[in-house]
């Protein structure tokens, strides 16, 4: 009998709208590949009932909290339902940008200099103390919530007077915030499928950085795949991405985001364990360059589910 596959989409995180788009695309791709797949919006459907509804396998197309932070993965482990992407620990770890950095730092992998602040510290420090706290990083800075995806709550800080406002914005989304040294070079992303590294993509957003609008709404964001790197740099980037991915115990598929500075050095940003699969998304773009159609890509991801 053919496997019955649930494509989990929507959900309740700040990335719900993106997840709905990803899920519908995945669903169409799986059906095109001849797979018996059904869309399930977890906002309306309790995942604990998946097995009794006859589902044999789960394709996770949820983004953000509750979908790629280990919570859902734990439920699916308990239900003994195979699912796409990373397991509980890797999903939880990669959703936490601070702890991801701590692991990479311990292994000597390149990351941008940063300062971490929690809400209590933020509320007790004066504006002058905050500025002193990040003085060692130098301006400009990027401020981001530790647990949000899709660039939600992120701000660039060009002047010390802007730091307070950027932190207030970030703390609206999280109780832990990262302040990082701004890297002015290009951004790259590297998709990983199983243990295969797909061609890198160079991202050129229309604005200051690759924010939510640039990722999902703008038609002015430019993507270059092949990325234009030399063969040597492409191999170096691929090796770094795979090392960073395995350091966090990721599996199945994912995407590693990287910045390059003016001297050509790469710095790790984060890993996405349930990347976007919309018309603007990067993994399908890299897969096309690799020779995989969208339906072949989603079928391969599903095949890697365990």
UniProtKB/Swiss-Prot annotation:
It catalyses: 2 D-alanine + ATP = D-alanyl-D-alanine + ADP + phosphate + H(+). Mg(2+) 2 binds at residues 270, 272. One of its GO terms (cellular component) is cytosol. Its EC number is 6.3.2.4. Its cofactor is Mg(2+); Mn(2+). It comes from the Bacteria. Its main location: cytoplasm. Keywords: ATP-binding, Cell shape, Cell wall biogenesis/degradation, Cytoplasm, Ligase, Magnesium, Manganese, Metal-binding, Nucleotide-binding, Peptidoglycan synthesis. Mg(2+) 1 binds at residues 257, 270. One of its GO terms (molecular function) is ATP binding. Signal peptide: none annotated. It is found in: Cytoplasm. ATP binds at residues 134-189. Pfam families: Dala_Dala_lig_C (PF07478), Dala_Dala_lig_N (PF01820). Pathway: Cell wall biogenesis; peptidoglycan biosynthesis. PANTHER family: D-ALANINE--D-ALANINE LIGASE, D-ALANINE--D-ALANINE LIGASE B. This is D-alanine--D-alanine ligase.
